[in-house]
Amino acid sequence: MKTVAFTTLGCRVNQYDTDAMRGLFIQKGYEPVDFDSKADIYVINTCSVTNMGERKSRQLIRKAKRTNEDAYIVVTGCYAQLAPDAIAAIDGVNLVIGTNNRHKIVELVEQLETTEKQINAVRNIMEQATFEEMPLYGNEIDKARAFMKIQEGCNNYCSFCIIPYTRGKLKSRRVDDIKQEAQRLVDHGYHEIVLTGIHLGNYGVELPGRPNLAAVVKELLTIDGLERIRLGSIESVEVSPELVELMATEKRFCSHLHLPLQAGSDAILKAMNRHYTLDEYKELIRNLRSRIPGLSVTTDIIAGFPGETDELFEETLNTVKEIGFTHIHAFPYSKREGTPAAVMDNQVPEAVKKTRVALLNEQGSLGLQTFAANLVGKPAEILIEREEDGWYEGFTNEYIHGRIKKGDTEYQIGDIVGGTVVSVDGEFVTIA
């Protein structure tokens, strides 16, 4: 049996794509193995959000070549879509696929075996108008929760972002296809599904009848055995009253939202071509917390965007302190060639970016500790993801690390178990 190894860089959408491609190989009789193992085929699913992502992608390609110089090396994902010729020039690369036509990956690999010629299968992503179906069946995922992509592409064109050029226009998945996949995942034992997309909040705008994200959630709530539905990243301006009402009234809809802020300064938000003001973002948070007590809010923030002075960064830091996020994914601005921000004046030095990221991460840790302390004495459940040193560990409904001491009752990975939060211990809330 031929073996295939996968590695993934970047976002949850990329992770879904990898799981789906793994499933295609499994269906054709290939055996998945660890990426560090010697394999017949290596698939590197790349990221292009930052220069670091592209550099890591190149490193992983070369690592695969060193591990087995006779293997077929397949490179896919956003970096492959953006720079196919550069990737094809890397020694050992046999097949380059971008962010479409991945449903043909096995066919293309088998074509390599007969032609022994490098294949560049990257096509113009802007010409793809419909969602590429690569459904999951459950056996291709080795995690406690399942990520399910329901939307692809983005039309926002934030001034710092390369993704619209690598993922193309908005493309949504049919509600029936989403529900069928969710049912298969539940039948396979998954109790939590995370809905993901490049521009999740714009789900359905191009479909007949314009079904929205709330309609998808409502449909999934009819599935017996699905105990948790969680949203991936969603833009604040796309959190509809219907979604808020569902989260406020439906226990299975997790009380956690990841709402990218990107900057806490109106001047920087405008330069980023974001579609909200700071006051609008804050007002949404106030309304959400009023309607959904105990809501956990996490975010993304870019440090050192062009023109971000010390004073403007201080505005962002003060905003973060005021809102109290439970996690901040802070990262330094990365200049992406071809985006408006790449040619803006007043680029910020790397050392300054690094310092600002550290300050933001510090505030994220403080926000988490405050939120976790407020959970003490309250009921909580975790989805078990691992067993380590006598503890079951996982995430609560609010996406807080939790743990339960292993006792007489044996639990399995993927089980949801609960009790009362008795303490906060480092990064965990302890439940008994």
Where are these predicted regions, by residue range?
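Conserved strand-turn element in the central/C-terminal portion of the radical SAM core barrel
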Residues: 157, 161-168, 228-237, 263-274, ...
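Proteins enriched for Cys/Gly/acidic motifs involved in redox and nucleic-acid/cofactor modification
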Residues: 1-203, 218, 242, 253, ...
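Radical SAM/AdoMet-radical enzyme domain recognition
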Residues: 187, 214-215, 219-223, 228-229, ...
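Generic beta-strand/beta-sheet core signal
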Residues: 7, 196-198, 232-234, 260-262, ...
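Hydrophobic, well-ordered secondary-structure elements that form the walls
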Residues: 259, 300, 320, 328, ...
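Short, electropositive alpha-helical surface patch
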Residues: 208-221, 241-255, 308-325, 350-354, ...
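Residue-level signal for the nucleotide or nucleotide-sugar donor/cofactor binding architecture
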Residues: 100, 173, 211, 238, ...
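Terminal RNA-binding accessory module
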Residues: 343-432
